[in-house]
Amino acid sequence: MLSLRSVLKHCLSAKKTCSRNISALYITGDKANENYVTLQPYMDFNKTFGERQFLEQSISSRGLDIRLETVLSKYEKYKTHHAQLSKVAEERERVTKRLKELTKSGSSAVQLEELKEHGKSLRNELKALKQTLYPIEDDFIHDYLHLPNLLHVQCPVGGEEKLLYRHGIPKSENKTTSHLARQELVHFVDNNRYYLMEQAALFDVNAMQSLARYFVNHGHFIQTANPDFVRCVLLEANATPLSDYHLVQEEHLQNKINTAYLTGGASFESYLGAMTKLCVYPSVLPLRYVCCGRSYNRAEADLYGPIPSLYTATQTNAVQIFVATQTDNEADSQLEHILNLATDFYKALDIPFRISYATAADLTPAESIRAVIEVYAPSLQRYVCVGRISNYGDFVSKRILFSTRREKHYDFLHMVGGPVLYTSRLIAALVEHGVRLEDCKLLGSISQKPVHQQDLQQFKDLFT
């Protein structure tokens, strides 16, 4: 196994984007000999294109450069060739069946030879049709997989976010000194390298563990541990831009298109590997998981610049939430449940923060709606994201085949998740607000007596 130091060295030298000619999520038959087919996503063309009005609204509201008419024309071409292929395959199957019947009944050699020649002709025709269909299929399916999820009815489609909750009002004062001035707490080198010290280092760990414990004790979540690396097929299934994470340069790569990325264990994509091709009983739903770990997402680094700081750092400790439900209404309820727990945690810190729905233009193609948790950063004089929760509907579960069985058919699960805490940004905001980190009230924390008091109490217990 590669050490983290060598992995980061390779990651930092990798290109920001990865040019790909083949999708890891869908591989056509002509390329399956060279590349292992990891996953075959479920694609319901009739349902997708049957909701054309909502799909067009989703594309336009997100500002995506997708021409639905072009995709539909490719679909018609694909259907025509696929129908022709199916017709020849059925004819060949009938000839094969007929040949077996005549062989058993002892028919004439001439008749048997005619059927054999006809079967060979159909086999060659079928092979030629497959070779013709592969590029058509490849062109259409990859465009189809780029189509976005439908928007939630509550998702803002205009240019403004929808405010859900606000706590405290930022003080209208001059620009506050940056948290980087507190060099006894933060030694910042660049976006990829920084060191938290003393109370900042303690708060970094305690805040993460406390929030996870709060979700376990008060939200009935199960705490898990996830891998730091995710294969490309899962990023594509979640419609995550490959530039969001560092590409890992592997020395011995068996599947050249299904490369690995350094995401961190506290990433939504890190959960997907355990859920791929998984079928659960309805009785265990909803699934509620929480995870503490690292996050190496580069997507938001440019939002809070141009001056590098803890607000722009690409790595941080984080708390990740993952929930799976059977229906969309249950997913909405779980999203509200998560936000209520997160609100309690941030209210206890008593600094200005707000929760709002992000606009459609800010969503990834897989998200139907996103709730953003932001705290006020005095040095930037603006709100910065310290957490977010997204509703994905059944968009991702269809791609990774994550389902539940109900009677004689399968239902794809609705997924909700996201990081509810980025510790580095929260620390930066707290320091700039003049809050003593050791005095912060962390819901879910374990109150411990000083060691000498514990020892004294244990000594007293010996005589009681």
From Swiss-Prot:
Protein name (database record): Serine--tRNA synthetase-like protein Slimp
- Just give the chief location class: mitochondrion
What does the function comment of this entry state?
Essential protein which may play a role in mitochondrial morphogenesis and function. Has transfer RNA (tRNA)-binding activity and can bind tRNA(Ser) but does not have serine--tRNA ligase activity and does not bind ATP.
For this chain, the family text in UniProt reads:
Belongs to the class-II aminoacyl-tRNA synthetase family. Type-1 seryl-tRNA synthetase subfamily.
User: What cystine pairs are annotated?
Assistant: none
The biological process GO terms on file are:
mitochondrial seryl-tRNA aminoacylation; mitochondrial translation
* One Pfam family cited in the UniProt record for this chain: tRNA-synt_2b
- Is the RNA-binding keyword given for this protein? yes
UniProt GO molecular function? nucleotide binding; serine-tRNA ligase activity; tRNA binding
Gene from which the chain derives:
Slimp
The record ties this protein, via Gene3D superfamilies, to: Bira Bifunctional Protein, Domain 2, Serine-tRNA synthetase, tRNA binding domain
**What's the source species for this entry?**
Drosophila melanogaster
Q: Where in the cell is it found?
A: Mitochondrion
Q: Keywords in UniProt for this one?
A: Mitochondrion, RNA-binding, Transit peptide
A single Gene Ontology CC annotation of this entry is:
mitochondrion
Which InterPro entries would you find in this protein's record? aa-tRNA-synt_IIb, aa-tRNA-synth_II/BPL/LPL, Ser-tRNA-ligase_type_1, Ser-tRNA-synth_1_N, SerRS_1_N_sf, tRNA-bd_arm
